[in-house]
A protein has these predicted regions:
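Short acidic capping loops at alpha-helix termini that bridge into adjacent secondary structure
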Residues: 39-45, 65-68, 115
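Conserved donor sugar-nucleotide recognition element shared by glycan-biosynthetic enzymes
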Residues: 20, 51-52, 76, 101
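A short helix-loop-beta submotif of the ANL/AMP-binding
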Residues: 85-90
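Active-site phosphate-binding strand-loop segment of PLP-dependent enzymes
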Residues: 91, 95-165
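N-terminal small-domain helix-loop-helix segment of the aminotransferase-like
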Residues: 1-50, 57
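Short N-terminal helix/helix-N-cap motif within the alpha/beta-hydrolase-1
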Residues: 50-56, 73-74, 135, 161
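Conserved PLP-anchoring active-site segment centered on the Schiff-base-forming lysine
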Residues: 61-83
């Protein structure tokens, strides 16, 4: 039996990278339940092995070498390290306690963002624990549309010490 299985070409590969359909459908149902978002499990869901893989894929998809990425400070160091590895220039934007750990849009509006393609946010925020509001997300979307950049909210903590995840 072992010898026969060793000769079977189907036994020498990896599992499909997109995950099994049931997993993707489960993710879609979860997003609908908690966030009211309809996602197509065949085209809009990609299971990952962890956050670093997701951050890498997103940066590869939207940023070319020499372009810029807005990264929160303080924030997850992987945003900076992967952006630099991929040849992007990191532009930090400060999150300050006196501003509730939210972006200072006045400062951002006055920055030269002509080469910025991607802006990372992280709410609930690590390491501050600050939670975003629907108003913050509306403001981020408006900012991104006007500046022609992609906002990515890295959201691994929405169900930790948070009664109403958004």
């Amino acid at each position: 039996t072992l010898c026969n299985n060793a000769h079977d070409p189907n036994g020498h590969g990896y599992q499909p990278y997109v995950g099994i359909p049931e997993l993707r459908k489960g993710f879609a149902a979860w997003y609908q339940r908690w966030y009211g978002v309809d996602l197509n499990p065949n085209t809009e869901i990609q299971p990952l092995i962890g956050s670093k893989e997701g951050i890498l894929h997103v940066t590869l998809a939207f940023v070319n070498p020499g372009e810029q990425v807005l990264v929160p400070n303080p924030g997850y160091p992987t945003y900076t390290s992967l952006s630099k590895i991929l040849g992007a220039e990191v532009i930090n934007y400060d999150l300050k306690e006196e501003d509730g750990w939210m972006p200072d849009f006045e400062t951002l509006e006055n920055m030269d963002l002509g080469r910025v393609k991607l802006m990372w946010t992280n709410y609930p925020n690590m390491p501050t624990g600050a939670n975003a509001t629907p108003e913050l997300y509306e403001r981020l979307v408006d900012f991104a549309r006007r500046k022609n950049l992609v906002i990515v909210n890295d959201n691994p903590y929405s169900f930790i010490l948070n009664e109403k995840p958004i």
